[in-house]
């Protein structure tokens, strides 16, 4: 029986089944080939994207470097022209005694004090002293505004004892207010200027405002933490031709032209908030410092004053203005400007490219964005590469773009 079974022929595959097996094997080989090809293409694509990302980052870094060179050249040109307008003065005991004596005279004596200070902005000419005397006659009238970097109504809010009196606020500032650390204008920070120029002020004896108007502006010295002279001059070529005081230029025409006084103050962005709130447009930085900050308006897409106050309660306790705090000390202390930008994370990502000098957010805006592995601070590099070409034509970083668009989510959340 077993022999009979063994003698029987083995079953053969039907012709149809054999062809099917051949097709399955061929298909398996094809799948293996395609899988290998796909892996090679993916690797090559990843390498190409990496190279593209590197090339784009290098191009954008080069653009920022060119911008820095342009700012330096503009500042050199401005200083050369402004040097012809500087009016150094040494204010010693004798000069002070003369001013104190003049202050005892009626309005004409106070007009002479103003004239000697060099603060009156009008060019010298007939009627100049008369204009100063007419101003001095009005005493503490809040509506009286001298032709100087002095905001009378604003100064009187800090010195209500002078309002409506016969005292001349500008001469009061020159003889008393400056020494007490009072600010003559929202855009001139006496303490900030004095701290940064202590040696120069000690040598000449002038008040901070007098030094700035006579000498400091022409030398490129900043009058306020939020007014960067070098940054501003680059946007106003006419300053290089005239040598005009940059802060006076900003108040006269620059603000209306939408020029930015500081890297962290975007005038167009702020103006759009004023328009949306139905607020009459004025000098944006002036409005921000006198009202907008308290209202929670944002000076820049990446800085949120309300968020900053919530995160750092000492700012409220000290009655400090959030952006000023961030620019002067907060940024270097590791504080973040808003939910869009994590300072500690940025510094960690930025470290391999070298140390950050100055404010971290300013560093990010001036090229740091293109030095880190995650330009979005939380988005993968491939997302960056897919849209980075857009940024080649913009003077804007990825985070700024997202923040301006209102972003559906916080990138670094």
PLM ranges: what are they?
Residues 2-5, 16-413:
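Charge-rich, low-complexity intrinsically disordered regions
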């Amino acid at each position: 029986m077993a022999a009979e079974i063994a003698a029987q022929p083995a079953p053969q595959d039907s012709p149809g089944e054999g062809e099917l097996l051949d097709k399955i094997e061929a298909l398996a080989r094809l799948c293996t080939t395609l899988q290998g090809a796909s892996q090679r293409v993916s690797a090559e694509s990843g390498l190409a994207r990496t190279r593209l990302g590197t090339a784009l980052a290098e191009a954008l870094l080069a653009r920022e470097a060119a911008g820095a060179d342009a700012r330096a050249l503009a500042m050199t040109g401005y200083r050369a022209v402004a040097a012809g307008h500087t009016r150094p003065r040494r204010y010693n005991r004798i000069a002070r005694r003369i001013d104190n004596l003049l202050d005892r005279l009626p309005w004409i004596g106070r007009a002479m004090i103003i004239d000697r200070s060099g603060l009156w902005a009008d060019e010298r000419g007939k009627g100049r002293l008369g204009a100063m005397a007419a101003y001095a006659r009005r005493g503490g009238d809040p509506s009286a505004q001298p032709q100087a970097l002095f905001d009378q109504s604003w100064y009187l809010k800090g010195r209500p004892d002078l309002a409506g009196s016969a005292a001349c606020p500008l001469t009061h500032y020159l003889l008393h207010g400056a020494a007490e650390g009072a600010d003559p204008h929202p855009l001139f920070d006496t303490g900030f200027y004095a701290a940064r120029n202590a040696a120069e002020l000690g040598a000449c004896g002038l008040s901070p405002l007098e030094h700035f108007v006579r000498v400091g502006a022409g030398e490129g010295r900043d009058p306020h933490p939020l007014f960067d002279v070098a940054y501003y001059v680059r946007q106003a070529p006419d300053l290089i031709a005239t040598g005009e005081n940059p802060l006076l230029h900003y108040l006269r025409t620059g603000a209306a032209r939408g020029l930015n006084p500081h890297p962290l103050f975007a005038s167009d962005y702020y103006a759009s908030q004023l328009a949306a709130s139905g607020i009459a447009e004025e000098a944006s930085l002036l409005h921000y410092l006198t009202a907008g900050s308290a209202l929670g308006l944002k000076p820049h897409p990446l800085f949120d004053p309300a968020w900053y106050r919530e995160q750092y309660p000492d700012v409220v306790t000290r009655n400090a203005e959030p952006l000023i705090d961030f620019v002067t000390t907060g940024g270097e202390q590791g504080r973040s400007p808003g939910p869009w930008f994590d300072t500690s994370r940025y510094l960690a990502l930025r470290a391999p490219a070298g140390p950050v000098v100055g404010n971290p957010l300013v560093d990010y805006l001036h090229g740091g964005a293109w030095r880190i592995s995650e330009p979005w601070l939380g988005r993968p590099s491939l997302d960056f590469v897919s849209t980075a070409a857009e940024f080649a034509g913009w003077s804007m970083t990825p985070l700024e773009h997202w923040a301006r668009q209102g972003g559906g989510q916080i990138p670094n959340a």
